[in-house]
Amino acid sequence: MDLQKIKKMQQAGKILGEVLEILVSRIKPGITEIQIDQLAEKLIKERRGESGFKKVPGYHHTICISCNDVVVHGIPTERVLKDGDVVGIDCGVYLNGYHTDMAETVRVKSSELKVQNDNIGKFLKIGKTAMFEAIRQAKAGNRVGDISCAMQGVIEEGGYSVVRNLVGHGVGKNLHEEPEIPGYLAGKIKNTPLLKPGMTIAIEAIYNMGKKEVVYTEDDDWTIVTEDGSISGLFERTILITEKGPELLTYLKTDAL
C-alpha cells in the first residue's frame, strides 16, 4: 500500500467529515442552497483544503445539492429550504494532491414540523443502512459485485429502486477513477473487479422512492432528477480497502461499521 497516499487521504477525509457535519447541522428552514455552498467553501479554506468539485471542468461550486426529486449534481441556487424538504449535500475536499468525496441526505425540519406519515424517515434510514452494508463488503479479496449486491438487496427489500446510470467510483489523485462501483449487480460477482489492499473508493447509495429512471433537467447540463418526480436519496463515503476490512476515510461522528 502507498502509505503516503493513505495518510494524505486520511487528512483530506477528516476535513471533509468535519465540514459535512457542520453543513448538515445548518440545514434548517429559511437557509438558501447558495448559503450552504458558501459556508462549505469557507469551512474548507479554514482547514487549508480546497474544493474538489471546483476542479471539475465547468463546475463552479463547492457542493452539489439535491432537493426532493433531484438525484445528483444539483447546482446551488437562491432557493430557500423549507420544512419537509429532503436535501442531500455532496461535497469533496482536495488536499495535498488527493481527493475525497462524501454525501449525506437529511430532512429539513424545525421543532414544529408537522407532516403526514409519508415514510421519509424510513426512506432515509434504508439508504444509509444500504450504504453501510455495502461498505462492510469492501474488504480485500471481495469483488465490486459484493458491494453492489449488498447495496441493491437492502434498497430493493425496503421497497425502493436503485438508480442504474449513476455509480460510485475509485477516488484518489482524481475525483473519479476506476473502478466503477454500481449500487446494483449486473451479471455475476466473479466477473467484477477484485478489491485489493490500498484501493480507495467512493461507495454511493443513489436511490429513489419511485421508479429508477432519471433524466437531465432542461435548463442546465448538470442537474439530474427522477423521471417520475419521486423523492431521491444520496449517501456516500470514501473508503480505504485494507487486509483487515474497510476503513472510513470520510465519516460523521455517528458513523459506525
Task: Label every model-predicted segment.
Residues M1-L257:
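Active-site neighborhoods and metal-handling regions in enzymes and metal-associated proteins
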